[in-house]
Amino acid sequence: MAIVKVKSIEDLRLPDKELMIWSRSKIYYKNGEYLKILNICDRLLSDGTNYNRLQVLEKLSELNGIKYLELPQNLYITDKEFLGYSMPICLGKPLDYLTEDISINKVIKMVMELLEDIQKISAIGILNPDIWGGNVLFDKNNLYLIDFDNCIYFDDIDLAYKVMGMSLFNLIIDRMLDSYDLNWLNDIDINYIKERIDNLESTDYIAFINLLRLKIARKSQEKIETVGDMRRCLRNEKLWQ
């Protein structure tokens, strides 16, 4: 977890072939870890945006006790450029693979654990505005947040946590419900809590999930124990007519 200064990008001895090509970087696999190499236009440290990115990523790399954030490790620079950084390999899949057999209780546990790590980001005055489906991975037991390139300094610690928490919450609810519209429920309590979360007035994410499960169970007169149970009830249009 350090800044490593090299003379040029050749010193990194990158593999001949990249593993992935993203819009602003290339990903390589080397020695059991990923190397993310920034595009040339995003490297110059004389550019304030690139310099700030280096500073934020350095601060993130120094965080301790993190389990569910795939943070940068070594940051590689030259005299004039921020070349990129190494990062651990995460074997999770996108949240689209959130299977129907997973229990609601496990979803709640995974969300709570990831939120604890997200709170550690906000506590050091950093906001990650890039929490979306491609950056949250799932491996049956845990959720992981990846890709911190767009993180910024943010003075309001409480607001930073609410912004990140709301983004994660909406993503999880969307995947749990398989994109079914919550308006189908037409429930005052559900709509009220959802609105407060979206307006950054509340962090009742877990309470919402539990209430949603309870409301669907009452409406369907069935036990709602898994993601599949919830989706099956939502597919039953007769319940919502």
Question: Model-derived features: where do they sit?
Answer:
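Conserved hydrophobic "DFG−1" position in protein kinase catalytic cores
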Residues: 29, 89, 137-138
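C-lobe/activation-segment region of protein kinase-like
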Residues: 139-241
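Residue-level signal for tight coil/turn positions that link beta-strands
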Residues: 31-32, 133, 140-141
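Conserved structural core of kinase catalytic domains
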Residues: 67-111
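Catalytic-loop of the protein kinase fold
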Residues: 118-138
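ATP-binding glycine-rich loop module of kinase domains
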Residues: 3-75, 98-100
